[in-house]
């Protein structure tokens, strides 16, 4: 039976470049791979055709011979010689094609596995609001893995050094034939590092790292808030056998303040005033992070009114304008009244015309009028 054209098998033009051929091969090989079509003889035959076409068209010399002489170039005694026949010859390595698709099967490529970078560490730092707003330097002590001072991270005893792995010759990977494919795996002798330690350091037992605690001075910039994270490069755990160290991340948590609440760059506080000041107006001393200031309260101030003190908030660590302090007035009801005070309040209430006095309590008048209308509507 006549063989099909290799370009036709892969569905590419004769002018297709290697990238297009590889793309077509990957798509078709995935579709007709024997593992996906177990027991399907037709799919197995197509897969053999696809592999054969790919092997010829990605080899410069074989492709040139095929373009000139067709299949005759690879028949016994033909121009190509070598007796190419499906899976039987050629020995092509397909792990580069499937490396991104079947990474686990083929060992993820041909790169030598490097010694592992040190792990990143996290430290939770609690700050007062004042420390967060103004900035502070704090000393912290953390347990970590540091580079061994005896072998300087190599893991080998003093006077010796790691030896090139005799199994993989420093490549970190070995090739194994599995069925139709040449599979790359991490070297079982050196575990992918490309070197072995024949005589390990007595201090770190060949790991290149030892357990220690270290003290660091951490500078917290002004304006940080809960959830902010500060990175100290290279202050994490030391890497294995001389690999780079990880980083230390300081996680900021600001304690609740007894006066202020922070919302982004603004501060909020509640300022209690008595009902006399609320009615007549006056001045009251309020706290800020910069010290005490006087707040002018106008006459007829209602509870819940916000007063903004510009520039008395927080300057964010990310820059921008400084926030404001917003004071929320809370009008306090007097308690523990004596008889004289109660009498005076009753007289004052009578002068207002009762709880629904229109002139002195406009909101109360509106409220009670609404209540009266509500009940009138119910009884109709």
From Swiss-Prot:
GO terms for molecular function: ATP binding; heat shock protein binding; unfolded protein binding; zinc ion binding. CXXCXGXG motif repeats lie at residues 148-155, 165-172, 187-194, 201-208. Binds 2 Zn(2+) ions per monomer. It holds the Pfam family DnaJ_C. CDD domains: DnaJ, DnaJ_C, DnaJ_zf. Its cofactor is Zn(2+). GO terms for biological process: chaperone cofactor-dependent protein refolding; DNA replication; protein refolding; response to heat. A zinc finger (CR-type) spans 135-213. Its main location: cytoplasm. It is found in: Cytoplasm. Keywords: Chaperone, Cytoplasm, DNA replication, Metal-binding, Repeat, Stress response, Zinc, Zinc-finger. Zn(2+) 1 binds at residues 148, 151, 201, 204. Homodimer. NCBIfam families: DnaJ_bact (TIGR02349), PRK10767.1 (NF008035). The J domain is necessary and sufficient to stimulate DnaK ATPase activity. Zinc center 1 plays an important role in the autonomous, DnaK-independent chaperone activity of DnaJ. Zinc center 2 is essential for interaction with DnaK and for DnaJ activity. This is Chaperone protein DnaJ. It comes from Erwinia tasmaniensis (strain DSM 17950 / CFBP 7177 / CIP 109463 / NCPPB 4357 / Et1/99). The lineage of its organism: Bacteria, Pseudomonadati, Pseudomonadota, Gammaproteobacteria, Enterobacterales. The gene is dnaJ.
């Amino acid at each position: 039976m006549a063989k099909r054209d290799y370009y036709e098998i892969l569905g590419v033009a004769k002018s297709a470049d290697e990238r297009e051929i590889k793309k077509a091969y990957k798509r078709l090989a995935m579709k007709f791979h024997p593992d996906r079509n177990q027991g399907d003889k037709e799919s197995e035959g197509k897969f053999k055709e696809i592999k054969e076409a790919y092997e010829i068209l990605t080899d410069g010399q074989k492709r040139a011979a095929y373009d000139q002489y067709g299949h005759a170039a690879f028949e016994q005694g033909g121009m190509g010689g070598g007796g190419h026949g499906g899976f039987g010859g050629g020995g092509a390595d397909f792990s580069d094609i499937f490396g991104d698709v079947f990474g686990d099967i083929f060992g993820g490529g041909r790169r030598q596995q490097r010694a592992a970078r040190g792990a990143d560490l996290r430290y939770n730092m609690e700050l007062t609001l004042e420390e967060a707003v103004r900035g502070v330097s704090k000393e912290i002590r953390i347990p970590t893995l540091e580079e061994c001072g005896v072998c300087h991270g190599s893991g080998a005893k003093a006077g010796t050094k790691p030896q090139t792995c005799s199994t993989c010759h420093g490549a970190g990977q070995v090739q194994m034939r599995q069925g139709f494919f040449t599979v790359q795996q991490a070297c079982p002798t050196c575990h992918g590092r490309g070197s072995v330690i024949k005589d390990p350091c007595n201090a770190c037992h060949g790991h290149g790292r030892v357990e220690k605690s270290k003290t660091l001075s951490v500078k917290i910039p002004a304006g940080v808030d809960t959830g902010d994270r500060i990175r100290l490069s290279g202050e994490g755990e030391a890497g294995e056998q001389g690999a780079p160290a990880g980083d230390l991340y300081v996680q900021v948590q600001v304690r609740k303040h007894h006066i202020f609440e922070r919302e982004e760059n603004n501060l909020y506080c509640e300022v209690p005033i008595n009902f006399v000041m609320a009615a007549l107006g006056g001045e009251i001393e309020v706290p800020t992070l910069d010290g005490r200031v006087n707040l002018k309260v106008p006459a007829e101030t209602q509870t819940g009114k916000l007063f903004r003190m510009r520039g008395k908030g927080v300057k964010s660590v990310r820059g921008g304008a400084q926030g404001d302090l917003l004071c929320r007035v809370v009008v306090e009801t007097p308690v523990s009244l004596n008889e004289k005070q109660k009498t005076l309040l009753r007289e004052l209430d009578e002068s207002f015309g009762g709880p629904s006095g229109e002139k002195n309590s406009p909101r109360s008048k509106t409220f009670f009028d609404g209540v009266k209308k509500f009940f009138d509507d119910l009884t109709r």
